[in-house]
Amino acid sequence: MKILIIGLGYAGNRYRRAFEHIASSSGLPLSLAYVGRKQKATGLPYFDSVDKALRVFAPDIVVVSVNDHSHAPVLKQLTGYRGFVLCEKPLVTPCDNLDELSGALEQVSGFALDLVERYSDATQQLREWIERHNWQLVRASFHWGKDRINDYRPTCGVTSEVIHALDLVGWLCPRAGQLQLNGVLGVRSDFSISGPEVLDTVQLTASLGEARVTGYASFVNIVRQRTVDLSFVDRDARMIHARLVFDTPRWDHDQLRIWTRGANGAEELLHEFSTAPDEPGLDTLHKLSRLCRQVVRAVELNEPPSQPFAGFDTAVELQRLLNDLDSDAQTPPPARYVHGETRVLLAEDSDLESLG
């Protein structure tokens, strides 16, 4: 099986490591190549254009892991491609024309947007509890942030971060309907090399059917903080609470707590779970490798994934939500992080925990 990685930067190398681990641990013969602006010391076959790579390498899977602003141009270059496309989130930026992408990808055999938190054991357990007990969502809130100040990687802004939380709320409660934004406040700044007025933070209200959602997401959170809180009612109108905590204290270390309160107000724990995976070779990659493994098995063995991929329709639906969020955000004058003559960027060889 041949896998082409378009963009072998930080994200692309994460995919490379994941696929190489899958090959070594499963025995599946995977052949990797990449497209980039310049050749790197990787030992992998290199192509300087997407068109040439598609013709010469003929990949079964194409991974799109270029920076946010290059997603749309690269996806359009896949017009006529008949293999499987695995795309880093978000699908495109708020400035791109979504309608032009449908035609470009109409012949692909499959598509998956990389929404890795769906592949957390904690997330999957909560989804099963909600479904099994027929809980009805009443409220949801999230805080989803990390520090991307002076990061060397270009970005379209906080829409690339908030997509995880917005997707999770809907994915956990699929029967509740489609998420609708009600209001958005935000802040723009020069935190990124991508410009002086990039949206770095949003605070939003939304509706998911009869449930109400509040959320905060930021690329200038000075610590990584990823939590989702949900309140439900069960068949007996009893209030149930659940909290998901992701990537704390380390990447892929996730926790779930589900509880209610008795008549006296005392907390009654219903379920508690935590995961701290430490499989060698998968540092920061445990959830991503699950997605990659399912893509490989779907293509190579025609094996249905354990859960449906976040397909192109889902990616477009989420992107329209992000576009509305970006355009509707009420913002004050931009904040300034750069006060000296030059910007000091985070080094490309920084540790994975800092970059994540």
What are the residue ranges of the model-derived segments?
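Beta-loop-alpha module in the N-terminal Rossmann-like domain of NAD(P)-dependent dehydrogenases
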Residues: 43-105
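N-terminal Rossmann-like dinucleotide-binding module
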Residues: 1-42, 56-57
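Short beta->alpha connector loops
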Residues: 9-11, 67-70, 91-92, 117-119, ...
